[in-house]
Amino acid sequence: MIESSSFMKKTSSENSIGSRSNIHEASTFSSEHENGDQSLTISQIVIRSDFANETSERQSKIILERFNEGIKNTAFTDSPVLGRAQPRLDVSYFAMAHRNQIVELFDPRGQRFGTVYSADPTVEIRYLGSVAKTCRYFGSFGKHVLNVPSGHFAKAMTKNRPIIYGEGPHVIIDPTFEFDERYGFVNQQEPFINHSTINILRVPSGKVAKVWIGTQPLILESRREPYVFVDAQFKMVEDTSESGNNKYFKNSSATFMEHGSIKRIIPHTGEVAITYNNGILTIIPPPKDGKPVIIDSPTHNFEGFIQTSLQTCLFPSKETKQQAIKDNKNATSDEVNLKIFQTRDSLRVGVVLVVAFRIVDPEIALTKLGKEGIINHIENVSFADMGKAIQLSTLQEIMYFNDTKPSANSTNETVHTIQDRVKSHLARDLCEYGIELARLQIETMKVLDSEIAKKLAGQSVTSAEFTTKQATLVKEYDIKTTEARLKAETDNIALEQKGKAIIAEAQAKLESAQKQAQALLITAEAQKKVQEMQGELFTKYPILAEIELAKIKSEALKSATLYITPQDAGNFMNSPLVYMDRLLGHQQKLEK
């Protein structure tokens, strides 16, 4: 037998064609194998094809080599003349025949061929037909070729034991080999693959699976690698309410899951799990490692969860109301929905209490009261303390019951109000049972005497009218005050803006005057420097002084009328400049 095992034994050489050592020798084991306690893997139970990655030409050669191994006398011939001629086949087909039930494959490669003719009556040679090289399964008389598609497994039987083949071609020489092509191929991604005693289980993310191995329960968490079991006593627990693959799995986020003696618990923040280990109370808080708590003991029982976060209850509770109806079918709605007490001034009042509490020590609370007795105890002691307080108080005192939290001086023996009388006693009582009182309030209070109730209602209406009127007056006062404040602020803003404008204008004028003065100073300084430079220049070059003096004189004579007498004409013509100097000097003397 060449291939047919649930556990493969690989040899060192896998490449030489026709070598006996490269073939996966098959040996099957029953489910009671020696290594039953060890975890199995896919590679241990699935037979891999050792030539799946070869070329198609090489795969065909390997199939022919292995299929025809040990055949001495062939049933085929390349010359149809020497035998029984067969129709020409496509290159993608094998021809198959047998000699005395020894099956043989032949690859004609598109050429003419035939089967051998034998005159020996003891020799039977029969042509079995053609098969495609890609055919998923073919074979006869104990020789088989199995081409497993990509992404699939093939489930077969050998020696009445299951065997699974991986993708790729396989050549099996085994007279006990059985394979049904209709049901034998299975997708590798199937969450649960069952083949007789072989079981492959893939638990998806966010799911868990419940299984039995004989009488041993297992809860399998999600993981990347599949779980593999080879055991005839393996059994999956299915959920009959689900269909498809969902019936095999449960949500991993379930707070509690039980399977045989295994308990899988996930307490959430704000609660703890109640368990009893051999009858002893065991509290399980939320795990800090983020993993579920697994208990594997038939005598360790799970009772439930109890909240440790803040709880708020309305009393009378629903159960108390139902019991009141059961005790008195003619009870009125007030008698059912309210707890009735009598005040010190003999008035009947009905109340509804709001109690907020937190269980700070679950072990003490459960040990002393039990899970179902906690709420009942809180309700009973709340009404008991409230009843005592109401009996010692008048209706008016009760109406001013406003404080809702335990008094800061609750340990003080001197109490002055109904709040202290109720809350201090209740807080001390609950503390002994591992319970912390967070809030106590009368949610509803009703005076059952109709006449008193009407008077109180009238007082309430009058008080409401006065309150409304007072609120209106206060509102009007606030409006007028706001308007006056807005007007004053507006006027202040206007004055402030006007003052800023005047200051800005004066500042601008001051800056302008300063700049003009600076300009005059700069101009005078410049003129002074120019005159000093001209003086230095005229001193160094006198001719320039004379030229400048001539310019001044010419400017002075531009608009003047000069009268020259005949006796001065000769002097003027000889030296005009000298004549003009004398004339100007004479004129200046006359002016003096």
UniProtKB/Swiss-Prot annotation:
Database matches in InterPro entries: Band_7, Band_7/SPFH_dom_sf
Superkingdom of source: Eukaryota
Region annotation (Disordered) ranges: 1-35
Principal localisation: membrane
Region (Oligomerization domain): 491-555
Stretches of the chain forming a coiled coil according to its record: 480-534
Biological process per Gene Ontology, one example term: exocytosis
Subcellular location: Endosome membrane; Lysosome membrane
Membrane-protein topology: Peripheral membrane protein
Example of a GO cellular component annotation carried by this entry: lysosomal membrane
Protein purpose: Negative regulator of late steps of the endocytic pathway.
Assembly: Homotrimer.
Domain remarks: The coiled-coil region is essential for oligomerization and binding to vacuolar structures.
Protein name as catalogued: Vacuolin-B
Gene assigned in the entry: vacB
